[in-house]
């Protein structure tokens, strides 16, 4: 590797809006403020909700439902 052409790789502090603080390595050179992290994101906490209440197939089946069928 060539010398003196690579950015400095330093330890910084990433602070989430939920209060979680993480020490990470980065070339950014300054501390970061995060909106979400793995401690408060709905996908990782299991508190996610289903936003899609029906797709195109459900709309088709609803529109062309045959009387007497399931």
From Swiss-Prot:
Gene Ontology terms: cellular component: ribonucleoprotein complex; ribosome
Q: Which gene is annotated as encoding this protein in its UniProt record? A: rpmE
Co-factor: note = Binds 1 zinc ion per subunit.
Which ranges does the record mark as transmembrane?
none
Q: What does this protein do?
A: Binds the 23S rRNA.
Q: Which cofactor does it need?
A: Zn(2+)
Pfam families named in the record: Ribosomal_L31
Gene3D superfamilies reported in the protein's UniProt record: Ribosomal protein L31
Query: Its family?
Result: Belongs to the bacterial ribosomal protein bL31 family. Type A subfamily.
SUPFAM superfamilies this protein is in? L28p-like (SSF143800)
Which NCBIfam families does this entry report, sorted A to Z?
A: L31, PRK00019.1
> For binding Zn(2+), which residues are annotated in this chain's numbering?
16, 18, 37, 40
Q: What is this protein called?
A: Large ribosomal subunit protein bL31
Which UniProt keywords are present, listed alphabetically?
Metal-binding, Ribonucleoprotein, Ribosomal protein, RNA-binding, rRNA-binding, Zinc
**Record keyword Ligase present:** no
**A GO biological process this protein is involved in?**
translation
UniProt GO molecular function: metal ion binding; rRNA binding; structural constituent of ribosome
HAMAP family recorded: Ribosomal_bL31_1
> What is the annotated quaternary arrangement, including any partners?
Part of the 50S ribosomal subunit.
Which taxonomic lineage is given here? Bacteria, Pseudomonadati, Pseudomonadota, Gammaproteobacteria, Enterobacterales
């Amino acid at each position: 590797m060539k010398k003196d052409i690579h950015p400095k790789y330093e330890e910084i502090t990433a602070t989430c809006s939920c209060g979680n603080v993480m020490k990470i390595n980065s070339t950014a050179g300054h501390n970061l403020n995060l909106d979400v992290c793995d401690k408060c994101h709905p996908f990782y906490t299991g508190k996610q909700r289903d936003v899609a209440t029906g797709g195109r197939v459900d709309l088709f089946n609803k529109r062309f439902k045959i009387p007497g069928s399931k």
